[in-house]
Design a protein with these regions (language model features):
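Active-site pocket-lining/capping segments in soluble small-molecule metabolic enzymes
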Residues: 1-101, 110-197
């Protein structure tokens, strides 16, 4: 639900009315289907943990059915402490691009681990995964395979999300575009960039 400052992976613009959020949660959960929030912004600071919009989403959906995907240890710790009913998924944004790193992550307290998608077609490595039943494969990535800047892309997208949310606080009726990014937030050249902002 935009504008979630905790969002990562792809910049989400727009806004959602709190009543709409509540209706979506009740409708989807009413069918026994969990929602999984993609709170994977790697650039979060402690000041972002108290974000009213994101905490409201977490409170509205705090019923033991829903899930959250995380990359930030800071946010993960905050969610585990304040919203212990949520199942937590480890994000592909962590760039766990070896089987050893993936297996280590699977030993931690995660419901699922989303694999780095550079592993998706490396079948000889996939056979070495210890807990395949707790792995998830991402099939709609924004980056090209083996993108050398993927970690930086995630950071830049996280900064864009923060900039967007801060912009909305100052100018709630203003239109946010690439042209009015705050100073210090740079866009990068990437064939997939248009699909992220």
């Amino acid at each position: 639900f935009p504008p979630s400052i905790w969002n990562g992976g792809r910049t989400q613009v727009g806004t959602c009315d709190p009543k709409f959020i509540e209706t979506v949660i009740k409708t989807i959960n009413g069918k026994g289907i969990p929602l999984r929030f993609t709170f994977t912004n790697p650039m979060l600071e402690e000041k972002h943990l108290e974000d009213k919009f994101c905490n409201n989403i977490m409170r509205l959906a705090d019923n033991g059915l829903n899930e959250v995907i995380v990359v930030s240890p800071l946010l993960e710790e905050y969610i585990r402490k304040n919203y212990p009913k949520y199942k937590i998924t480890s994000s592909t944004c962590k760039r766990l691009d070896s089987v050893d790193a993936l297996n280590d992550e699977l030993e931690k307290d995660y419901n699922l681990v989303v694999m780095d998608y550079d592993l998706n077609n490396r079948f000889e490595l996939l056979e070495q995964i210890k807990h395949k039943d707790r792995c998830e494969i991402l099939v709609n990535s924004c980056c090209q395979p083996k993108c050398k800047r993927r970690s930086q892309h995630y950071k830049d997208i996280g900064l864009q999300q923060i900039a967007y949310c801060e912009y909305l606080e100052k100018y709630p009726d203003g239109r946010f575009t690439k042209e009015n990014l705050p100073e210090g937030i740079e866009l990068f050249e990437c064939p997939s960039m248009d699909s992220t902002l």
